């Protein structure tokens, strides 16, 4: 069971709790992602709650914050399935479709393969952008990091040497405190 079938193409594992008496015999085996016929491991992780749903949880580290943490714990690959405009990319059979259309196509395809058991309403919190009103999709992007403490040393030096000064001077104390505690 899943609330986001269109993300199955980015799944890298299925998690089951080691305390799940009904399913723990599957840990260490593999299962197949339908439609793309890709094998992924079944792993033991307490992120899967034996009392919730089927007790097994698909893990999509590139598109879910909780799954990302599971992926880090198990060294799972990150498979990005989204373009920057939130359409599905070439890692899926539905490249170019928006997520809602891809969801419908995924469900239709699963149904045509005889793999759809049932559809139930499931209340959940969906994040929307404050200004855009659009669903926020977790998306892996490149990020760059600077060594802020190293930059702070030079920034403090120019103030200490009088090459730069604050007006009013009272802000200097706040500046130095901020720079000494920068991370």
Q: What does each model-identified segment do?
A:
Residues 52-183:
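Residue patterns forming the tRNA-binding/recognition surfaces of aminoacyl-tRNA synthetases
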Residues 5-84, 154:
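Catalytic alpha/beta core of large soluble enzyme barrels
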Residues 1-3:
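Short hydrophobic beta-strand that contains or immediately precedes a catalytic carboxylate
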